[in-house]
Every structure is written in structure tokens, then in C-alpha cells.
């Protein structure tokens, strides 16, 4: 309706491959909107009393995904939040559809080349980027794992309400790009400079 101001979404879910900047962009975006930021992986670790790698070691990916699903559902009680999801959180029909119904989903898109550059030093702490002996992948093996995972996950990521390509952008520029994408939805009335 013309002249009627749209309400901002109660929750903004940031999704994308590990290393795309969800945990870096999220707090800055939240500050600009007057929202609170939460990282879903941090919430899972707090509730489990273990790190993500420890959860993977003790129970495998299946146990981790069950805890992740439960933590995602808990965000329904949060208002005025920017929520950084894990790289695989919304790579399932059930979780993606739930997030699409319960907030605005923003996919932070990054090229494979940039992901390899960002993730090479961090592979030691990322179970999905390790071999069967829990050793970090490197070089061509790391690139192949990223390509393989991204190929499967991007089908889900691209269903987000907003897709924001952050390649070549500084963190500040990426925050501005997300804000620009959200403005059409009416979030800008809360924006702080």
C-alpha cells in the first residue's frame, strides 16, 4: 500500500559457505540496524559445552546437525536479531524452509577462489575441510572439497530472499550491499549511521 511503511523483519538469517563473512558482517549489520547479533555455532557450542570440532569428533556430522537444527528453532523466540548460520545449516529443505518462514534470509555469495584463499589458514579448525584422519586439507584437495560442498549447498543458498555477491568488497562495502538488498523490504527505517 502506498505511503505505508513496511515493518522490518524480526530476524535476519545470514547464510553462505564457511568463510563467506557471516560472523564478520553480521555484528556490523546488526549494529547498523539496532539489532542484536548471534552466531548459531557459538550458541551450539555454549549449549553443548563443547567446540564444533569436539562435537564432530564425539558424535559425527549427524549429531552436530541435530544440535544445529534445535538451535535454529530456538531463534524463533528472538526479536530484532541478525543470526549467522553455519555453512550447512540451511543446506537442507527443512531448515531452509523454516528460516524462510521465520525471517529474511540473505546469502553472502563468494567465489571458490576467494573461499580457498580465506579458508586455507582455517582448515585446521573446520571439520568439513579435513581428511578422514582429521588433518586439514591443503592445495588442490582443499579446493576440490570446497567445490564439492559448494556445488551441493549453493542450490539451497540461492533460494534465499536476497543474494549478495561480496567478491571484491571490503567488509564495510559488504555490509552496505546487504543493507541495500534489505532496503526493498523496509529495514532501512531502523538503520543507524
Per-segment meaning from a language model:
Residues 101-154:
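A glycine- and Lys/Arg-enriched "phosphate-lid" helix/loop adjacent to the NTP-binding pocket
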Residues 2-7, 32, 117, 138, ...:
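NTP-dependent small-molecule kinase module
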Residues 23:
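Walker A/P-loop
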Residues 40-100, 122-125, 130-131:
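ATP-dependent small-molecule kinase phosphotransfer cores
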Residues 17:
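P-loop (Walker A) phosphate-binding loop of NTP-binding proteins
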Residues 31-42:
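Post-Walker A helix-loop "phosphate-sensing" segment adjacent to the P-loop in P-loop NTPases
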Amino acid at each position: 500500500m502506498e505511503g505505508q511503511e513496511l515493518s522490518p523483519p524480526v530476524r535476519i538469517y545470514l547464510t553462505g559457505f564457511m568463510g563467506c563473512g557471516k560472523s564478520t558482517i553480521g555484528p556490523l549489520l546488526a549494529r547498523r540496524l539496532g539489532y542484536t547479533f548471534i552466531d548459531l555455532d557459538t550458541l551450539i557450542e555454549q549449549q553443548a559445552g563443547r567446540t564444533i570440532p569436539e562435537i564432530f569428533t564425539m558424535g559425527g556430522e549427524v549429531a552436530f546437525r541435530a544440535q544445529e537444527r534445535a538451535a535454529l528453532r530456538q531463534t524463533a523466540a528472538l526479536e530484532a536479531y541478525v543470526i549467522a548460520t553455519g555453512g550447512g545449516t540451511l543446506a537442507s529443505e527443512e531448515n531452509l524452509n523454516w528460516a524462510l518462514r521465520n525471517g529474511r534470509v540473505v546469502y553472502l555469495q563468494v567465489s571458490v577462489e576467494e573461499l580457498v584463499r580465506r579458508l586455507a589458514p582455517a582448515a585446521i579448525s573446520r571439520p568439513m575441510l579435513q581428511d578422514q584422519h582429521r588433518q586439514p586439507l591443503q592445495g588442490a584437495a582443499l579446493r576440490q572439497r570446497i567445490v564439492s560442498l559448494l556445488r551441493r549447498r549453493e542450490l539451497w543458498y540461492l533460494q534465499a530472499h536476497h543474494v549478495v555477491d561480496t567478491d571484491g568488497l571490503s567488509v564495510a562495502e559488504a555490509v552496505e550491499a546487504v543493507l541495500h538488498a534489505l532496503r526493498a523490504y523496509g529495514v532501512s527505517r531502523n538503520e543507524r549511521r
